[in-house]
Amino acid sequence: MVTFEYRFDVLPGKLKEYEKYSKGAGKDIWLKFKGVKAVRVYKSMLGGSSPQRLVQVDLESLAALETILTDPGFRKVKVVFHGLVTHVSDSLLTQVSDKRK
């Protein structure tokens, strides 16, 4: 399993559009694809800190991620997303430890 993580800020003046997007075209976009195991979305509790949002997508494999990123429907939604956000960065993560109390 791999985790694709991306972080971003909503562009100033675009919050309402972003919220509309996240309830419309962007809603559950990842979960529509085979190979996605879980999606977690986080929002900063500190208000003005950057990044304001963080999304983690757990996938069965890198191949699943590649299939999603090249899907024409996903790419179309991604273009809309990038018109609403800034300071986008991403990472591919693999878990090395999980300790719980």
Where would I find each of the regions flagged by the language model?
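Short, well-ordered beta-strand segments in beta-rich or mixed alpha/beta enzyme
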Residues: V2-D9, R40-P72
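Non-catalytic surface loops within mature trypsin-like serine protease
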Residues: V10-P12, L59-S61, T94-D98
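Short amphipathic alpha-helical segments
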Residues: K14-V41, G73-F81
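Glycine-rich beta-strand-turn "strand-cap" elements at beta-sheet edges
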Residues: K37-L54, V77-K101
